[in-house]
Amino acid sequence: MGAELKDSEGAGVVASRRGAAMASRYISRLARVSSHLSPNPLMASEKEAALAAAPPSDSPTIFDKIINKEIPSTVVFEDDKVLAFRDISPQAPTHILIIPKVKDGLSGLSKAEERHFEILGRLLYTAKLVAKQEGLEDGFRIVINDGPSGCQSVYHLHIHLLGGRQMNWPPG
């Protein structure tokens, strides 16, 4: 017996149970990736994208493709250790992602070890430099989402730098 799935346009597709499960996983992964590539992701919220995200691992992520220039991005800062680029689905007038160029086991902040001390400091200092470069003298916010409950959707440590408007509290 088949199951009906809906594609991104809402059309029904009949599939076997196994095929339906595989298609559902594929759609979830596609939605997670598209949330960082498209201003109109398949999933409506970051929470849904985070819950659908693959568990943390050392497998390549969308950020690895950006680091390797396989996917275009608008880079605002780069050195030998860190890359900063504009988020393609900004949540503020200025929304920049700051990432280590080498993941080194840092799929999220909760995975940090003492050996990551230097890169963690470098990421925060880079956030300060980029904020100044972007003219955020009045203030800015940095955010690190960690794990599914923290709405992390890409398992490569990254800092969101948000600014250009009055932020609200509490944030989430």
Where is each model-derived feature located?
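HIT superfamily nucleotide-processing domains
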Residues: G2-G172
